Swiss-Prot record:
The gene is RRI2. Residues 1-63 are annotated as: Disordered. This is COP9 signalosome complex subunit 10. Residues 1-45 have a biased composition (Acidic residues). The keyword Signal does not apply. Component of a COP9 signalosome-like (CSN) complex, composed of at least RRI1/CSN5, CSN9, RRI2/CSN10, PCI8/CSN11, CSN12 and CSI1. In the complex, it probably interacts directly with CSN12. It comes from Saccharomyces cerevisiae (strain ATCC 204508 / S288c).
Length: 645
């Protein structure tokens, strides 16, 4: 190719390249404009996207909260599954994850999260309860861990001020029942054979556990659920304090406990005794009073004790479950027995109106019911019968059976009952067998010696023991002495009926037995007293009128034609013959009570109709005229009347 062609080509190429460069420049300018426009569009888009992202962030926050609640629910269910598998440590770790979850700013979400945290803490405490009551060794470390968890729960409740789940009070109440359960198989008045060391540890834990919630008692408010929770806390603290002092110090009759009892039973404007207390609290009050009687043979606050018995019996009667719990029935029957025994010592009028043997029958049945319930509880083993309470129940049953058997035609040996057979061979039953034999044979001094072998019962069963002595003396008087002697001095009878040298029988005691036997128509043999010579005559041959002028002899002095003796009799005649029952029926003591006897005398005195006196001239003459020293007797009457004036 020639140079011109080459130059042309170069020229054309250069032109093309120039054109391309020009076009490139034009395109660059266009691109700059487009970039500016694009940047402006992008900035607007960025703003829109930022707003959208902010909106999505806010929406994502609530979605995240929803997811947290779902997560808490899943973790909670997993923890409960592990709990059912008895994998307590792993379950506790899962519940702790819920408790330590982050709290967000949304009020609604916080409330939901707080609810889950509260439920997780409740489950942690209940897990600990299962570990505590099933773990044999190393329980002390576990107790400290539970108290730490309890402190966490207490602080959490103070922080949220109960402003969460409406069931918070019920959940707390249930938790208190789990960690501070009822003591149904041990009694405050029967702790001789309990494992004290183990029980003190449990009671001490319950006391420290409930102390963590004392602040709730100071929280004001009239919410029924809050007041119910406060009542439960107050009750649990009272029970723990009483048990702790009983096990450690032995004495529960302190000002501290007395003040707590006053708070527990006091009626106020918000609630009554029945509303403030339930079966558990009244059960503890009854045990407290039973223990008081066991120590002193006396109940100081009888009114409150009776109120507790009635309320306790009413609660049990309304529930078939409660009526089948042997522990509760033992407390109920023991309370009733103690109240009757204390009433006898106090001469309670309400019990004075009750027939004596009916009351003894009631006591015997209740003693037997207690023995049956103790048998069901497995507490009639020989090792248990050494306690004061078991001796009290066994002896009470045997003693009341002896009293009733003495007047009954059906002779049922109390040692034949299955509940007594279980204890045969124990020292207390051997002593009771000797007591029963001596009573049956009316060996009074040996009877006293046998009863003296159980001195711990001489106070709590003093009333029944004195009844046994009195009944034994009465039976010996009528079954042995009266049938053997026709005449015997009072002093000789007293020596035969002597129980012991320390418990001497007096002359008045013997006369009381004789007079009561007449009034109750229990004198087997007719007897007559000669109090001038202190002699007692036994036998029907002594049925002779004591006055020299019997009513038959007085009637013989009246002529057959004088039929209207009452009309013609003078006042002094009437007073004389009335003493020998000529015109009026005599007032008899037999078959009458003391009250009936004196009422009859009063009625005779007030309603007597005096005869008309026709002749007043011989009023100073004492009739019948043949009576010796009648004039002297009249002088004595006048002298007495003058002195009375």
């Amino acid at each position: 190719m020639s140079d011109e062609d080459n130059n042309y080509d170069d020229f054309m190429l250069s032109d093309d390249e120039g054109m391309e460069s020009i076009e490139m420049e034009e395109e660059t300018d266009d691109e700059d404009k487009q970039n500016i426009e694009i940047n402006e569009d992008n900035s607007q888009d960025d703003q829109d996207r930022g707003a959208a992202r902010h909106k999505q962030h806010e929406q994502g926050t609530f979605e995240k909260h929803d997811r947290v609640e779902d997560i808490c629910e899943r973790i909670f269910e997993q923890g409960q599954a592990l709990k059912e598998d008895e994998r307590y440590k792993e379950a506790r770790d899962l519940f702790l994850k819920i408790y330590y979850k982050e709290e967000f700013s949304s009020d609604e979400s916080i409330e939901r999260l707080m609810t889950w945290k509260f439920k997780s803490l409740i489950e942690i405490l209940r897990l600990r309860a299962l570990q505590l009551y099933f773990q044999k060794n190393g329980a002390q470390d576990l107790v400290l861990q539970i108290l730490e968890d309890t402190a966490t729960m207490s602080v959490f409740l103070q922080r949220i001020d109960f402003q969460i789940d409406g069931n918070i009070f019920e959940l707390l109440s249930d938790t208190f029942e789990v960690l501070a359960p009822k003591w149904e198989r041990v009694f405050l008045f029967d702790i001789e054979k309990v494992d004290r060391e183990n029980m003190i540890c449990k009671i001490d834990f319950q006391k420290n556990f409930m102390d963590q919630f004392q602040w709730i008692l100071r929280k004001p408010g009239k919410d029924c659920k809050l007041q119910n929770l406060q009542r439960i806390i107050r009750k649990k603290i009272f029970i723990a304090v009483v048990w702790y002092q009983r096990l450690t110090m032995g004495n529960v009759f302190t000002p501290e406990i007395s003040s707590q009892i006053e708070i527990l039973v006091k009626d106020n404007e918000c609630s009554s005794f029945e509303e403030n207390n339930d079966l558990e609290s009244v059960s503890m009050l009854l045990q407290y009073y039973i223990l008081e009687y066991m120590n002193t043979a006396r109940i100081n606050n009888r009114r409150l004790f009776k109120k507790c018995i009635d309320f306790f019996e009413m609660l049990i009667s309304k529930s078939l479950t409660f009526s089948q719990e042997s522990g509760l029935m033992v407390i109920l029957y023991t309370s009733k027995i103690v109240f009757i025994l204390d009433s006898d010592s106090e001469n309670d009028l309400s019990f004075a109106l009750m027939r004596y043997y009916d009351r003894k029958e009631e006591l015997k049945n209740m003693f037997l019911y207690i023995l049956k319930h103790l048998e069901e509880m497995g507490k009639l083993r020989e090792r248990d019968i050494t306690s004061l309470f078991h001796k009290f129940i066994l002896s009470g049953f045997i003693f009341t059976s002896m009293i009733l058997e003495a007047i009954s035609t059906d002779k049922i040996n109390p040692f034949g009952f299955e509940q007594v057979k279980i204890a045969l061979g124990s020292p207390i039953v051997n002593v009771l067998e000797d007591v029963y034999r001596c009573f049956a044979q009316l060996e009074l001094r040996q009877l006293n010696a046998s009863i003296s072998l159980i001195p711990e019962l001489s106070v709590v069963l003093s009333g029944i023991i004195q009844d046994i002595y009195y009944l034994a003396q009465t039976l010996k008087l009528w079954r042995k002495i009266a049938r053997l002697y026709s005449c015997i001095s009072i002093s000789d009878i007293i020596s035969m009926l002597q129980i012991s040298d320390d418990n001497e029988m007096t002359r008045d005691d013997l006369l009381t037995i004789l007079m009561r036997s007449i009034m109750k128509n229990r004198s087997v043999v007719y007897f007559k007293l000669d109090l001038t010579s202190d002699l007692v005559y036994f036998g029907d041959e002594n049925k002779v009128m004591l006055p020299r002028c019997s009513k038959e002899e007085f009637r013989l002095m009246i002529s057959p034609k004088d039929e209207e003796t009452t009309e013609k009799a003078r006042l002094i005649d009437f007073e004389y013959v009335n003493d020998v029952a000529i015109y009026n029926n005599p007032t008899r003591i037999r078959t009458k009570s003391s009250k009936e006897f004196f009422n009859t005398l009063r009625k005779s005195r007030e309603t007597v109709k005096l005869p008309r006196v026709s002749n007043q001239s011989n009023e100073d003459t004492f009739l019948p005229s043949y009576m010796k020293f009648s004039n002297k007797y009249l002088e004595l009457c006048k002298l007495a009347s003058n002195n009375l004036e």
